[in-house]
Amino acid sequence: MENKIEVNNKDEMNKWFEEFKKGNGLVDTFTNPYSFCESVPNLERFVFQMASATDDAQKDSIYASALVEATKFCAPIYECAWVSSTGIVKKGLEWFEKNAGTIKSWDESYIELKVEVPKIEQLANYQQAALKWRKDIGFRVNANTAALSHKVLAEYKVPGEIVMSVKEMLSDMIRRRNLILNRGGDENPRGPVSREHVEWCREFVKGKYIMAFNPPWGDINKSGRSGIALVATGLAKLAETEGKGVFDEAKKTVEALNGYLDKHKDEVDKASADNMITNLLKHIAKAQELYKNSSALRAQGAQIDTAFSSYYWLYKAGVTPETFPTVSQFLFELGKQPRGTKKMKKALLSTPMKWGKKLYELFADDSFQQNRIYMHPAVLTAGRISEMGVCFGTIPVANPDDAAQGSGHTKSILNLRTNTETNNPCAKTIVKLFEIQKTGFNIQDMDIVASEHLLHQSLVGKQSPFQNAYNVKGNATSANII
């Protein structure tokens, strides 16, 4: 077997794709870039099947079947071909050999990370490595393979018939987020943070230093129920949505305030002024500490960069450019028929290729007891095989034309359009998956609700599985659903 997508740069990619498009019925009616999707997937039958299911194994199987049906034909073909092309495969794998130091903090702790929640530094280092990998190998070929840095969507337009369902999903996402922010894993649980306090901090860091004289809660040193100064909790919360740059801005504001007080020293009580400056700097330092240990930052750092993690798993499994086509074929077949975890693991162990057993050995331990939203994004699980699938299994590289048969992998759903002209098929499909899950399971008992995670990805503005959203600013659950 050999990789038939012999491409090393964008010009060669464009040429390959034009040839491929001539012989295959690619369309872009319902998807962003071209795909094999000719109609919006109809998942209604899975709701009825789920309603009559009697055990969890049966329910899991039904949901897996619905996922394959939903995503079988909607992957972005151009981008999938690029991710699996000979040039990217070669550079993508070689990068890990040359950058052992870059991935050291989490790669050397892989065994521990299979069973334990990662340290904040291990998450931050993963995200830095992912961005470096993208830059070093020239991964970006268009906007659909870019590292995003915009703000989350302010508005998300959906058809009238699903508005209430999307709002229900958002409400559950907010409930989970509040549980995490107010309780889950912070070394200093700070309690809820008032929007009024955050807004005050937002204005303060813009340079409005006179506001320090009279904050809405009274004394600048006043603490909340947690015993932590309200300035500190407000700044930490602001940093979660605006980025850690707010701390530098806050320090500049304090410098400006100090300059003002010094300039008007004849009208200022020196002891009080010095005390205010000292305390403000102390509150900023506390805010930085809270931010560093925050569950929100942890959840942000745990976001998977689909392409980067998938290449890391190939590298760890000893896959080479020569054996890559066998992995591609395996994942293509995996996406044609839904398989439960047991069957998928058995398939990996049954392949004569060494990478099968090695991928199996990379799987997270079943004894991982924490909330799985915190699991390190470089740790492979049975569910995350789908991340590899969308990268390498959409197009079997030894026989690219076979892609027309369809191969379903979860993140392909992000390629469905979100515009109103097409009635937002992305949201409609995600909502139907949520309805299927809700019919079979108690949503509130689940650590991660897969359909809600997909909605979150859409709300942060992802329109492709291959975009990195680590630097997207803002809170996705604040979007106005209209």
UniProtKB/Swiss-Prot annotation:
Pfam family, one: Nairo_nucleo
Superkingdom field: Viruses
Post-translational modification: Cleaved at the DQVD motif by host CASP3/caspase 3 in mammalian cells at 48 hours postinfection giving rise to cleavage products of about 30 kDa and 22 kDa that remain associated. Only the monomeric form is cleaved. Little or no cleavage in tick cells. Caspase cleavage reduces the viral polymerase activity. Caspase cleavage is not required for productive infection in mammalian or tick host cells.
Record's keyword terms, sorted: Capsid protein, Helical capsid protein, Ribonucleoprotein, RNA-binding, Viral nucleoprotein, Virion
Residues with site note (Cleavage by host CASP3/caspase 3): 269-270
InterPro entries for the chain: Nairo_nucleocap
UniProt site (Homooligomerization): 213, 267-268, 276, 352
Cofactor note: Endonuclease activity is stimulated by divalent cations such as Mn2+, Co2+, and Mg2+.
A molecular function (GO) term: RNA binding
GO CC entries: helical viral capsid; ribonucleoprotein complex; viral nucleocapsid
Locus of motif DEVD: 266-269
Coiled coil: none
Chief location: virion
Disulfide bonds: none
Cofactor(s) needed: Mn(2+)
Subcellular location: Virion
Subunit text: Probable homooligomer; forms a double superhelical polymer. Monomer.
Record remark on domains: The DQVD motif is a CASP3/caspase 3 cleavage site essential for viral replication in host cell. However, the importance for viral replication is apprently not linked to caspase cleavage. This motif is involved in homooligomerization.
Function: Binds dsRNA and ssRNA and probably participates in the packaging of viral genome. In the dsRNA binding mode, the nucleocapsid protein specifically binds to the vRNA panhandle secondary structure formed at the termini of viral genome. Does not discriminate between viral and nonviral RNAs through ssRNA binding mode. Displays dsDNA endonuclease activity that is sequence non-specific.
Family designation: Belongs to the nairovirus nucleocapsid protein family.
Protein name: Nucleoprotein
Classification lineage: Viruses, Riboviria, Orthornavirae, Negarnaviricota, Polyploviricotina
